[in-house]
């Protein structure tokens, strides 16, 4: 934990090459600029391109270690690398990671996360927006209010109060959720427990399964086009099923007399 009212940035650079001279040449290509303007502290890495060079058996690693007061806002951009954050993050966070992974704890303020071509794992979220593309696995423990745009990605959420989501070409698993507003295309979605309301504006060429519907649920509304919906209705509750404009489909209700 960092209890000082300052920001400390430490950068470690490692270059491996076939000779010491060649390693030094690669090291000289790396420029790291840190500066402070007003209340903003920034650090940017620039790697100069090399012309007509054989880079076989060569590599470089750049690690940033940042210590700052937990309530400070942060804007993090990482490409071809990972972002690891502490267990508690209290400031507003704007995170962009491509070709790398994000591993973080809890977020108590607003969070914007863009992840492409990697994996993410976070703890608890309050108010967050996620933009996911080609994410192999995205794990979220608990969340209060989420907006997610997901393409070619797989998500696993434990518990969430409110979710607005568009998912295409992926998989979604939610253990427990109160309110859902979704668009599902070419995907598979599984919900453990739905507590209150579900609205799916488009279930297209997709599968949606709800394992447990709370007896106190208020509404389940699904607009399906070549999609499959399976809902386990509670035995001791009253409900009404309205199936309209059905073509090339069927509606089966089992287990009720």
For the regions a protein language model found, what residue spans apply to each?
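Eukaryotic tandem repeat interaction scaffolds
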Residues: 153-230
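Acidic (Asp/Glu) and glycine-rich low-complexity loops/linkers
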Residues: 1-78, 84-97, 101-115, 119-133, ...
């Amino acid at each position: 934990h960092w209890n000082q009212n300052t920001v400390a940035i430490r950068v470690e650079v490692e270059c491996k090459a076939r000779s010491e001279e060649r390693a030094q040449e690669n090291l000289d290509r790396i420029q790291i600029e840190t500066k402070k303007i007003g209340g903003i502290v920034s650090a940017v890495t620039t790697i100069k391109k090399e012309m007509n060079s054989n880079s076989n058996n060569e590599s470089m690693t750049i690690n940033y270690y940042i210590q700052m007061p937990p309530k400070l806002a942060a804007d993090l951009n990482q490409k071809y690398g990972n972002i690891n954050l502490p267990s508690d993050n209290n400031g507003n966070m704007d995170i962009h990671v491509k070709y790398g992974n994000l591993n973080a704890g809890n977020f108590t303020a607003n969070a914007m996360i863009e992840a492409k071509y990697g994996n993410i794992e976070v703890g608890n979220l309050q108010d967050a927006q996620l933009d996911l593309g080609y994410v192999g696995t995205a794990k979220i423990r608990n969340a209060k209010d989420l907006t997610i745009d997901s393409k070619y990605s797989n998500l696993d959420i434990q518990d969430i109060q409110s979710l607005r989501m568009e998912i295409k070409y992926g998989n979604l698993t939610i253990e427990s959720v109160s309110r859902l507003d979704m668009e599902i295309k070419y995907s598979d979605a599984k919900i453990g427990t739905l507590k209150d309301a579900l609205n799916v504006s488009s279930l297209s060429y997709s599968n949606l399964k709800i394992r447990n519907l709370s007896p106190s649920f208020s509404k389940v509304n699904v607009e399906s086009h070549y999609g499959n919906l399976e809902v386990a209705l509670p035995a001791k509750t009253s409900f009404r099923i309205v199936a309209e404009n059905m073509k090339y489909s069927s509606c089966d209700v089992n287990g009720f007399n």
